[in-house]
């Protein structure tokens, strides 16, 4: 296993483990998701540079666009949750009360 592949997979797994174990606050879950998306962006950008293909060079930009949309939707949910419930604790949220 190459060191670059190991670093990308370990960074992605670190974000995934943080998302699985730190599910008490919405902000920490959003930060773990952003770390995972950043790892995927760097991996796809490196992959498209190694291939020297023009057809795969647009994939990192598409991934970055989806990451920005995910971040804006997550921050909107965070603001709405903190205004309505007073905190970002995920244990206080109930979908039946919305």
Curated annotation (Swiss-Prot):
| Function of the molecule | Core subunit of the mitochondrial membrane respiratory chain NADH dehydrogenase (Complex I) which catalyzes electron transfer from NADH through the respiratory chain, using ubiquinone as an electron acceptor. Part of the enzyme membrane arm which is embedded in the lipid bilayer and involved in proton translocation.
Q: Which UniProt keywords apply?
A: Electron transport, Membrane, Mitochondrion, NAD, Respiratory chain, Translocase, Transmembrane, Transmembrane helix, Transport, Ubiquinone
Q: Gene3D superfamilies, alphabetically? A: 1.10.287.3510
Q: Name one GO biological process term.
A: ATP synthesis coupled electron transport
The record's family statement is: Belongs to the complex I subunit 4L family.
Which EC numbers does the record give? 7.1.1.2
Sequence intervals crossing the membrane: 1-21, 26-46, 58-78
Signal peptide region = none
An example Gene Ontology CC term for this record: respiratory chain complex I
Q: Which reaction does it catalyse?
A: a ubiquinone + NADH + 5 H(+)(in) = a ubiquinol + NAD(+) + 4 H(+)(out)
Where does it reside?
Mitochondrion membrane
Return one GO MF term.
Answer: NADH dehydrogenase (ubiquinone) activity
As for membrane topology, the entry says: Multi-pass membrane protein
This chain belongs to which protein, by name?
NADH-ubiquinone oxidoreductase chain 4L
Q: Where does the protein principally reside?
A: mitochondrion
